[in-house]
UniProtKB/Swiss-Prot annotation:
EC number(s) recorded for this UniProt protein: 2.7.7.40
GO molecular function: cytidylyltransferase activity; D-ribitol-5-phosphate cytidylyltransferase activity; protein homodimerization activity
Record's protein name: D-ribitol-5-phosphate cytidylyltransferase
Keyword Cytoplasm (UniProt): yes
Superkingdom of origin: Eukaryota
InterPro entries tied to this protein: IspD/TarI, ISPD_C, ISPD_synthase_CS, Nucleotide-diphossugar_trans
Main location: cytoplasm
Site (Transition state stabilizer) residue list: R81, K88
Keywords on record: Cytoplasm, Nucleotidyltransferase, Transferase
Record organism: Danio rerio
Length: 462
């Protein structure tokens, strides 16, 4: 394929590729903005990036978790409401199943010692492959039951086997849905400490709609006063002995038709749960539109920063500084070429912009990808490299060069690195040059934010 020219009017179209239709895209975007305004902070899908977990090491209260904590993730659902043949927990975002994101939200915390994932027997091998591929080191996979409560009970029983030293009994166990990947450490800490003190705890959210009861003839019977009620959410925490005993004592009817773990602890052990207000990001991926919203949140989180690498030419350095100003919506660092192999810079972000002002070898791309592999930087999330080539004189596209770039992009894509190219012609006309610089910033931002795999290997021309 030849050089692709992208007009400014196309940028909005590229940005919406993750949504099924423009109307739905606008609705989801408004929903994300609502999350942002309610929390009064940047959108945060549960500290998805590993460096966030490292920064959290100094958070107040961490030291008080001096007892073993484990998690049980029921993941045996069929995803009927999603309307897909693949269960929703195994639907992929960036070629990575949703359940892997949820597992990481727990694994990244050093005070969580074990994550038991409960899956249907038919999905056992699939889950084991996910654990191996994404290097989940704290996970034990067990078979689920025919209902949600039976699956949770199976997960809890994994800790009761005294002969299995690899799964020691925890003091506190957290039960969480496999399709709620956006759970933050702060909430998990509150749930854990409240469970240790009270015996049981759970996250709640305000009701967004009024709940009504209907008659058998489908007439209104009565409605509940919304202000008095809350929606029960996940995660929920328990002293292990309490919740395990509750499941041992509960009836077959509870196991078959029940859905609320807090109710079992209250009814069969007399333990009244402490309820904790959760953030708006606790929502559950249930429908196709939720999967699109989850992808949008992950993209937003991965796009907060970038590293601009400038080659030695004066023109490249100046272009790097200008691009940094135009990318003011992101945190950016400008470093000279040669330092990109420094782990300090590689581990800070998953977005890299390489600027050259003369014909240069593409070997640096392979060297950079090798560095990513050495620090396991691209296993969980795709890394973006935007190669900006500044031409001081207008040149026509070279088909051999274009083919080589596409082949290189295809090679590194197998290692979860997304390579894009942008050619920008320098103009002596100030107004035209300013327009080109503006388009360069806009296209670069879109490529980083959208992470569209279909555009890898394309050399865009501004």
């Amino acid at each position: 394929m030849g050089t692709v020219t992208i007009q400014l009017s196309c940028l909005r179209h590229i940005r919406k590729l993750c949504f099924s239709c423009p109307w739905e895209g606008r609705r989801l975007f408004k929903m994300l903005l609502q999350f942002h305004h309610e929390t009064q902070r940047p959108l945060d899908p549960g500290c998805l990036l590993p460096q966030d977990a490292e920064r959290s090491a100094d958070q107040p209260g961490r030291a008080v978790v001096d007892f073993p904590v484990a998690a049980v993730l029921p993941a045996g659902g069929s995803g009927e409401r999603m309307g897909l043949t693949t269960p929703k927990q195994f639907c992929s975002i960036f070629n990575r199943p949703l359940i892997s994101y949820t597992i990481q939200a727990f694994e990244r915390l050093p005070w969580i010692v074990m994550v038991v994932v409960v899956v249907a027997k038919d999905n056992h091998d699939l889950m084991l492959n996910i654990v191996r591929k994404f290097n989940h080191t704290k996970v034990k996979v067990v078979h689920g039951g025919t209902t949600r409560h039976r699956s949770i009970y199976n997960g809890l029983q994994a800790f009761s086997d005294s002969t299995d030293s690899s799964t020691p009994k925890p003091k506190v166990v957290i039960i969480h849905d496999a399709v709620r990947p956006f759970v933050e450490e702060d909430l998990l800490l509150k749930i854990t400490l409240a469970a240790k003190e009270q015996g049981a705890s759970g996250a709640i959210r305000p009701l967004v709609s009024t709940v009504i009861a209907t008659t058998s003839e489908s007439y209104l019977d009565h409605s509940l006063e919304r202000a008095k009620y809350r929606a029960s959410e996940m995660p929920q925490g328990f002293l292990y002995d309490i919740i395990f005993q509750a499941y041992q004592r509960c009836s077959e009817f509870d196991l078959e038709f029940g859905t609320e773990c807090l109710h079992l602890a209250l009814q069969y052990c007399g333990t009244n749960a402490r309820l904790i207000e959760g953030p708006p990001t606790l929502w559950k991926v249930t429908y196709k539109r939720d999967l699109a919203a989850a992808e949008a949140i992950i993209k937003e989180t991965l796009s907060v920063s970038a590293c601009i690498i400038a080659e030695a030419e004066e023109e490249a350095v100046e272009l790097a500084k200008t691009l940094q100003k135009n990318l003011n919506m992101m945190e950016t660092d400008v470093i000279p070429c040669g330092k990109e192999s420094n782990v300090q810079y590689l581990s800070k972000t998953r977005n890299f912009i390489h600027i050259s002002a003369s014909a240069s070898s593409s070997l640096w791309v392979l060297e950079m990808v090798k560095c990513f592999e050495d620090i396991d930087h691209a296993r969980l999330y795709p890394v973006v490299i935007v190669w900006v080539q500044l031409s001081m004189t207008k040149q026509s596209a070279d088909s051999q060069e274009t083919d080589e770039f596409m082949a290189l992009a295809s090679e590194v894509k197998q290692r979860n690195v997304l390579l894009y190219g942008i050619k920008i012609d320098h103009s002596k006309e100030l107004e035209q040059w300013q327009r080109s610089l503006e388009r360069l910033g806009q296209i670069t931002l879109v490529l980083i934010r959208d992470r569209n795999m279909a555009l890898t290997g394309q050399m865009l021309h501004v």
